Amino acid sequence: MNLEEFKLNDSNAEKQIIKPPKEISKKVNLQSSTSIGELEKYLNQGYNLNHNLIEGKVDSKILFFFGKCHKQDQKILDNKSGELFDRMLSSIKLDRSNVCLASYIPRGLENLYDDEGFLTQIQMVNYRLIEIVNPKYLIIMSNYCIKMLLATDLSSMSLRGKWFDFNTPNDTTPKKCRVLYEPEILINNPELKKDAWEDLKEIQKQLGG
């Protein structure tokens, strides 16, 4: 090999060395997430989320927040509970297509409902979810959701029947919040349906229906 050939090979080696590296995807940051899609990507970094965090209309002015689904559920509030929920919505001229529906424990991750590490993380995810959706009205269903979202051991029976303000830690605009009996409670306690109907009428009144 002569000097010119050596220089040529050396030059080619340098070109290979300085070849730009492949772009590395950045991790999604929770607080910088500005859409539900980004929030789902954030959660997928640590957990196998196979379902959407939100069902229905993402930009609805009313967000119904459930507690946790059953493993066999194909949607948030399914089977008999889902049928009753649909009738409850219909009674005030609403349906799943024009409300926003979320579950505190995302569907498909029900087995993590008592995992302390997950619960710490999902609390902040749900706060951010509320901030992104930014509903005018927040309707909380289930004692589990009350305990986790409102940080209280009071039951739906104690909290229903009135409006109150709810703020996430980073939210400056309070949401008008109300507790509504979850369908399963109404199925097991039909005598509570009268109270639920009064709550539904109040929700309809606020929505201008």
List the predicted regions and their residue ranges.
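A polyanion-binding, active-site-adjacent surface
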Residues: 2-209
